[in-house]
Regions:
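Short, conserved micro-motifs enriched in small and acidic residues
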Residues: 113-126, 278-286
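Acidic/histidine-rich catalytic neighborhood of metal-dependent amide-processing enzymes
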Residues: 121-201, 234, 240, 316-332
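Solvent-exposed alpha-helices and their adjacent loops that cap or buttress functional pockets
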Residues: 77-79, 106, 140-142, 166-170, ...
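Metal-dependent amide/peptide-bond hydrolase catalytic core
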Residues: 1-5, 193-332
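Conserved hydrophobic/aromatic beta-strand scaffold that supports enzyme active sites
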Residues: 72-74, 175, 195, 228
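Flexible loop/turn segments at secondary-structure boundaries
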Residues: 94, 156-158, 183-185, 217, ...
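Acidic/His- and Gly-rich active-site-bordering loop/insert found
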Residues: 2-118, 137-142, 152, 184
């Protein structure tokens, strides 16, 4: 294999690679939308799937879509009996707030590319395709076919790839995914997304929480949390004091507004980050719960807030929940 020739091809294709990543990033493909008969995981992921197949065909690969859930671009002689897989995905988490650029445009600044999906996982998917293109143009003789397989539901459970595997599609003899860090990750955590529901009886206290909302995805640190409060006149001074004296943590900001109807809205801004590395974010929900506790809310609401803060709080390893795990090989 002539690596100098391959590197020269990659250098030649640099601008085309960047433009193609931007082309795919420009398709908003947030999961969780209502399914359609032709779009099992919503129209956004389906549109990104179609765009991926179009791009693959344009660059000379055998391409097809499986049940509008999985896209394939394949390199190598069809007579080769074995196949190596490259696994990626084209669905993304919501863009959220706080962007200084259009998350669906793919902006280049200081030689960096910014946009939702640039790193997870549209950029890596297209980079893998261009690596396959470089192998082909360099005349590398393959012993096995290389199949780039992209799913449309990775962020919400990988049901697309699960369907691909369980339906009897050809399976690879080996594979890897560029949805990770270089050079290698050889293990992956499990995850649970619980949903809890509990009624709160009115307690007649001078501060009551009417609503508390935060986050746009279960696998990301929430960057914004909003609480609407009913505050008795006797408690307004206490609310003002708590807001003024609250020592906002890193990357956090608290604001308070009173509506014409007399309700108060507390807004906590934080810093979103992928759920695999929550220590780098600032959890707006956890910080706002801490503020609400300082207001001395009583009854069942107060007990719930106390429990959430005690068990979860701003911890990122689940110590108080009893789920923290460490070993010498994989770390935390």
């Amino acid at each position: 294999m002539n690596m100098e020739k391959i590197r020269a091809i990659i250098d030649k294709d640099r601008d085309s690679l960047i433009d193609t990543i931007r082309e795919l990033v420009a398709v908003p493909s947030v999961g969780g939308e209502a399914p359609r008969p032709d779009a099992p995981f919503g129209p956004g992921p389906k549109a990104a799937l179609d765009k991926f197949v179009e791009i693959g065909a344009r660059h000379g690969f055998r391409t097809w879509a499986f049940e509008n859930q999985v896209g394939v671009a394949e390199l190598g002689d069809e007579s080769l009996p074995e196949m190596i897989a490259v696994l990626a995905h084209v669905d993304v988490v919501p863009a959220g707030e706080g962007w200084s650029c259009d998350p669906w445009r793919g902006m280049i600044k200081d030689d960096l590319l910014y946009g939702r999906g640039v790193a997870d996982d549209k950029g890596p998917a297209i980079s893998a395709m261009f690596a396959m293109k470089a192998l082909r143009e360099a005349g590398v003789r393959l012993k096995r076919r290389v199949r780039l397989i992209v799913g449309t539901n990775e962020e919400l459970g990988s049901r697309a790839i699960d369907r691909y595997v369980t339906s009897g599609q050809e399976l690879p003899v080996a594979g890897f995914t560029p949805d990770a860090e270089y050079p290698l990750i050889n293990g992956e955590k499990g995850s649970i997304t619980p949903k809890c529901r509990a009624p709160f009886a009115p307690d007649g206290g001078d501060v009551q929480v009417l609503s508390l909302d935060a986050g746009v995805a279960s696998n990301a640190v929430p960057s914004k949390a909003v609480a609407v409060l009913k505050v008795a006149p006797a408690a307004e001074a206490r609310l003002s004091r708590v807001v003024e004296e609250f020592a906002a943590p890193r990357d956090a900001k608290l604001t308070c507004e009173k509506s014409a109807s007399g309700e108060y809205t507390l807004t906590m801004d934080g810093l979103a980050f992928h759920g695999s590395r929550p220590q780098y974010g600032s959890n707006a929900a956890a910080n706002l719960v801490r503020v609400l506790r300082l207001l001395g809310i009583g009854g069942e609401q107060g007990a719930f807030l106390d429990k959430i803060d005690a068990l979860v709080g701003t911890q990122t390893r689940g110590e108080n929940l009893g789920v923290m795990l460490y070993d010498d090989v994989s770390g935390f």
